């Protein structure tokens, strides 16, 4: 510091010395192939659900992970409804 008051560049310099660590914080650990996360298997599922208009049975065959099929179930029991081909013609598309 030159003079009685510190200037902005001098303050920034002092802060950088406090903030920048001297230790190496990078992780150089490598995972073996056994430790890597295995892909979850895609399993075929048959979904039977009613048409939201006429109630006729709709059958879908999907391939999903166990987590994926649970998500699909939550959607079909909640905010997503299926429509049969006959009722689809009655719908107005935008």
From Swiss-Prot:
A zinc finger (unnamed) spans 51-87. One of its GO terms (biological process) is DNA-templated transcription. Keywords: Activator, DNA-binding, Early protein, G1/S host cell cycle checkpoint dysregulation by virus, Host cytoplasm, Host nucleus, Host-virus interaction, Inhibition of host innate immune response by virus, Inhibition of host interferon signaling pathway by virus, Interferon antiviral system evasion, Metal-binding, Modulation of host cell cycle by virus, Oncogene, Transcription, Transcription regulation, Viral immunoevasion, Zinc, Zinc-finger. Highly phosphorylated. It comes from the Viruses. A motif (LXCXE motif) lies at residues 25-29. It is found in: Host cytoplasm; Host nucleus. GO terms for cellular component: host cell cytoplasm; host cell nucleus. This is Protein E7. Residues 1-43 are annotated as: E7 terminal domain. Belongs to the papillomaviridae E7 protein family.
